[in-house]
Amino acid sequence: MSTTTETVTWSQYKPQETQRRLSRSSTITPSVSEYRSGFSKTAFGNIELEEIPDKQGNITRATSNLESNSYPKALDPDACPPKRSIALVLLNNLMSEMSLTIALPISAAYTEILGGTDAFSGLVIGIPTMISLVCLYPMLRFANPKSANGYTLYFRPLIVSCISQIIGHLLYSLAYRAQWLYLILIGRMCSGVGFTMFLYHKTYLTDKNFVGQNRSTFLATLNILAQILGSMAGAFLGGILAKASMHLTDPIWNQYTAGSWFMLFIWIVYSIFLSIFFKEVRVGNTATNVRKPESFTGKTAPLSFKQKFMLCFLSMAAFISIFNVAGYQTSVPIYAKALYHYNPFQSGNFLSLSSLVIAPFVFFSTFLSKWLEDRQIMLYGFMMGIVALIVHLVLDAVHKIPVQPYFVLYSIMQFGFSVGSAPLVSLATKQLHPKYHMITGVVVQVGISIGETVGSICGGAIFDITTVGFIAMNLGIALLVFIQLLYLWTFIKTKTG
């Protein structure tokens, strides 16, 4: 039996204002008992919907127009979603990154034993994000049904990511037993459906409907920190499980499949916790007479030429950042094996140690948003990445690149481009009307998906391209986006926070 409950939510909250402002809105002051019972079950599933009043305890149904480039006036600048929902989204990001990178140390050896090449290994690493790009539109339709009044139901892509990751890891693990090379690729493609969640990690943590302006950059950088920790944990577990299972002859659990089986079990446990603890923050209710926010009525000014150019720039910045990081990550086992005679375990340690080193710096960079603008964070991050690429290019060209300088340069490059790409969505949400928030997320995710796939393929073929050519290519496209950043410098000025 379904129960209809009145849900008054984020976009309708408004602090007490003057009589002139109140004349255009109706105010409801709930009792304590009403607020305590402010969780409801709806037709969207058995997911709790949280309702939180403003600091004065009032819930206001605002019907005034939103400014095209500012946060909704009804939203507290320090507002954020329920903390346990934030934790589950960040954990999903971390585990998704683990699923993406746990194959890095052993991928080349796994594909080789089944008859594949290094380039095919790069394709195995990079294909999931391309599949996520293909599945992006169906997922957008699924997460934004008509009954949601234009808002996003984040639980839907979350649970889809769990199911697809479980199936993907299962197929990847069974490829050795089947002795079929392409089952590895099919398994990774199934996992790619779950990687559509990379879009929703960004949009959830910067959603202007329930994330205040003072929180968006901070949460966006926490999202990058989760990715860094996921890269560290995935590469480390992939290497150590491969080493621990090196002498096993079991066709099911061995050095090539142990990491994938491990992630399969972790995803099963996570999906159970997700179903129990995730709380959907809903910003509208069809059962009430609340007027739909103007941000979704289509009565907003179209994007200007500079705003469109900015979106193209953000997509390209995302592409280049991830292209560099993914390309280098994929090339490390191949590059280190040729130069330093590294095995998969040592390559996994190399990747995980680098992530471990930069993780504290990424964490401290989350507080930079209090003093630095988004554009300044991007500038400093890209500058660090470019300098690391220049030094690596010179050392590689003269064939004087010991493992220690290589490790330092790789870590600086990864840190620079990771931090530089952190505020992309946050910057756009501060510049554009809330109506364009999801479009911004999609544009950035397109750049990330293409960069991940192309970068991984190029990294896997590093010796076919030549090492100097690979590094020079990374440097050239990084300089291109750096020039675009300088061109847009005055246009993308935003407040700190």
Swiss-Prot record:
Q: What is the topology of this protein in the membrane according to its UniProt annotation?
A: Multi-pass membrane protein
Q: Which SUPFAM superfamilies match?
A: MFS general substrate transporter
Membrane recorded as keyword: yes
Q: Which GO terms describe its molecular function?
A: transmembrane transporter activity
Q: Where in the cell is it found?
A: Membrane
Instruction: Classify the source by domain of life.
Output: Eukaryota
Keyword field contains Transmembrane helix: yes
Q: Which Gene3D superfamilies match?
A: MFS general substrate transporter like domains
Compositionally biased residues, Polar residues? 1-16
Please give the residue ranges the record annotates as the region Disordered: 1-29
| GO CC entries | membrane
Q: Which residues cross the membrane?
A: 86-106, 120-140, 155-175, 180-200, 222-242, 258-278, 309-329, 348-368, 377-397, 407-427, 443-463, 468-488
Where Phosphoserine occurs, the residues are 64, 295
The cross-references to PANTHER family, in alphabetical order and at most eight, read: INNER MEMBRANE TRANSPORT PROTEIN YAJR, MEMBRANE TRANSPORTER
Q: What is this protein called?
A: Uncharacterized protein CC613.01
Whose protein is this, by species? Schizosaccharomyces pombe (strain 972 / ATCC 24843)
